A protein has these predicted regions:
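Conserved acetyl-CoA pyrophosphate-binding loop and the N-cap/start of the following alpha-helix
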Residues: 69, 73-81
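Short hydrophobic clusters on alpha-helical segments that form packing/core surfaces
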Residues: 60, 82-86, 103
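Conserved beta-strand in the GNAT
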Residues: 38, 43-64
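Conserved GNAT acetyl-CoA-binding A-motif
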Residues: 86-99
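A short, internal acetyl-CoA/4′-phosphopantetheine-binding micro-motif in the GNAT/acyltransferase core
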Residues: 63-70, 98
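Short amphipathic alpha-helix that is part of the acyltransferase structural core
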Residues: 1-26
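Short loop/turn motifs at secondary-structure junctions and domain boundaries
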Residues: 27-31
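Conserved active-site alpha-helix within GNAT-family acetyltransferase domains
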Residues: 99-117
Length: 117
């Protein structure tokens, strides 16, 4: 398994990013200014985008895993990688998400807590 930081041709990951954010126009707003990470296990499994929101806050804008690979821990591995990557750079990482029970469980299992709805 390998996680890569992607600096060029970020739109090549659009099909996967669209699984977590159905509006391409919204993805376009954060993709170029954000940091894109891709997790490979033989081939591409998951991606995420993190943006700087202030000196001490970053935001997880998008995290997606191909559906056939759900439940294999790829999303969690990617989250733990970015936690480590940004440790010391930011004091807070936020995420905005829907209220689907399975996605809330995923984020809570990986250390996020609900601050408001």
């Amino acid at each position: 398994m390998e996680i890569k930081s992607i600096c060029e041709n970020k739109k090549q990951f659009l099909d996967l990013l669209l699984l977590a954010d159905e509006q391409e126009s919204m993805i376009d707003k954060y993709l170029e200014r954000g940091d894109l990470f891709a997790l490979y296990d033989s081939d591409l499994r998951s991606v995420c985008v993190v943006t700087r929101e202030s000196d001490d806050v970053c935001e997880l804008k998008n995290i997606a895993t191909y559906e056939k690979w759900h439940g294999n821990g790829y999303g969690s591995k990617l989250l733990h990688y970015i936690f480590s990557h940004y440790k010391g750079k930011y004091t807070t990482m936020i995420v905005g998400t829907g209220d689907s029970p399975w996605i809330l469980r995923f984020y809570e299992k990986n250390g996020f807590r609900i601050s408001h709805r």
